[in-house]
Regions:
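C-terminal capping region of solenoid repeat domains
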Residues: 1-4, 249-251, 264, 289-292, ...
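Leucine-rich repeat
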Residues: 2-201, 210, 310, ...
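Conserved hydrophobic position(s) of the canonical leucine-rich repeat
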Residues: 46, 78, 107, 129-132, ...
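Short, aliphatic-rich beta-strand segments
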Residues: 49-53, 81, 263-266, 316-320
Length: 389
């Protein structure tokens, strides 16, 4: 490579270089300072700070690095501020200093992962936050965030918490008036009353219970504009969805109220998921267009008595993951192909690891009658990268 090619990158405007460096972890961005005098201070113009404790030898070294970066960074606006300390404890005064500095620079996206998290008062009313991820792995400490949250611009909220901090998570959710995407993962909580969340702006919802044996009282979500839903089936009992009164249907036998707006549904496999519960979900989502499911762990196939409305009118794509090629898998797939009238694509991810078994499944399904004449079948597995009918 000639010298002109080498200089082409170095001669770019500082604004362009800072955007490039902002796309990489901050530790790597700082390392570019040794390339030449031209590069020595380019990293100080980054608009994203992304620091993970893992590459450092000890939490104290990582904390010192964060201090140094914030002292030298010249950007007046931080688009992304991400700190990942796993379950390690960071001194409260130090964490408060970092968060306040990010807020001073009008942080847009904030992600924090640590063992014990105490938020400064200034965080509760941040007007620039649009995306927030909080992961608190502490299981022994109880933190009570007393001050109400008011995050007027927050549209994406991702929470991972254990035990009592779940109550704090609920306080946080209620302080986001324009929330569009919510992901909530936690073990369980104790509360005498059911918790009700009215979020008319919500479009995407993901609910995961980390441990199935922990008690969890009922959660009710009033979400009239929901489009995407991802659940593990541990939520069948303690979870309800409601819409505005004009859209609420009577409770069906399924795990959800009938939710006419959902277009994307993803179901994770666990001890509660079975073929019957899958179709209960489908019955609840009449406008469903895209379905992703993992194979139930143990369940005998029982053909539904009626075909869900979404399969007759709207269901366009199906992703079936962890397929073992067993009898119940084949019966389910044949049923979907034979009854989904507007299906365009079904993608099957095989997990058997046996070439002969996977190829037999492929051959059988390619010969299976399809109600939708435009439906294609894609296979993904060790025996083939993909095969499309």
């Amino acid at each position: 490579m000639g010298s002109k090619d080498v200089d082409r990158l170095s001669n770019m405007p500082n604004e362009v270089l800072s955007e490039i460096l902002s796309l990489m972890p901050t530790k790597l961005a700082v390392r570019t300072s040794i390339l030449s005098k031209r590069w020595r201070y380019n990293w100080t113009l980054v608009t994203s700070i992304d620091i993970d404790v893992l590459p450092f030898h000890g939490v104290e070294n990582c904390c010192a690095f964060v201090d140094r970066v914030l002292d030298l960074c010249k950007s007046t606006e931080i688009k992304l501020f991400r700190l990942r300390f796993s379950n390690l404890w960071v001194q409260e005064s130090r964490m408060t200093k970092w968060i306040n500095e990010a807020l001073r620079r009008k942080v847009g996206e904030f992600e924090i992962q640590c063992g014990l998290l105490e938020l400064p008062i200034s965080f509760y009313t941040c007007k620039t936050l649009t995306k927030l991820r909080v992961e608190n792995e502490c299981q022994n400490e109880f933190m009570d965030w007393q001050t109400p949250f008011n995050l007027p611009c927050l549209k994406t909220l991702d929470i991972v918490v254990y035990r009592h901090p779940s109550l704090n998570a609920f306080k946080l959710i209620r302080g986001c008036p324009v929330l569009e995407s919510l992901s909530l993962q936690f073990t369980g909580y104790n509360n005498d009353n059911e918790d009700i969340f009215s979020i008319p702006t919500l479009k995407r919802l993901k609910l995961i219970r980390k441990l199935k044996w922990r008690s969890c009282n009922k959660l009710v979500f009033i979400v009239p504009n929901l489009e995407d839903l991802c659940l593990d089936s541990r939520w069948c009992s303690p979870f309800e969805m409601e819409e505005l009164p004009s859209l609420v249907s009577e409770l069906s036998d399924g795990p959800l109220r009938k939710v006419v707006t959902i277009k994307h549904l993803e179901l994770k496999s666990d001890d509660y998921l079975c073929w019957e519960s899958i179709f209960q979900y489908l019955e609840s989502c009449s406008q469903l267009e895209h379905l992703t499911i993992e194979k139930p762990r143990e369940s005998d196939w029982i053909e539904p008595q009626t075909v869900p409305t979404c399969m007759l009118m709207n269901l366009k794509t199906i992703k079936f993951e962890n397929c073992m090629g067993e009898k119940d898998d084949i019966q389910f797939l044949e049923y979907m192909l034979g009854n989904a009238e507007v299906l365009k694509r079904i993608t099957i991810t095989c997990k058997s690891g046996l070439m002969e078994k996977e190829l037999q499944l492929c051959a059988r399904l390619l010969k299976c009658p399809r109600t939708s004449k435009y439906c294609e079948i894609n296979f993904v597995g060790k025996s083939f990268d993909s095969a499309t009918s």
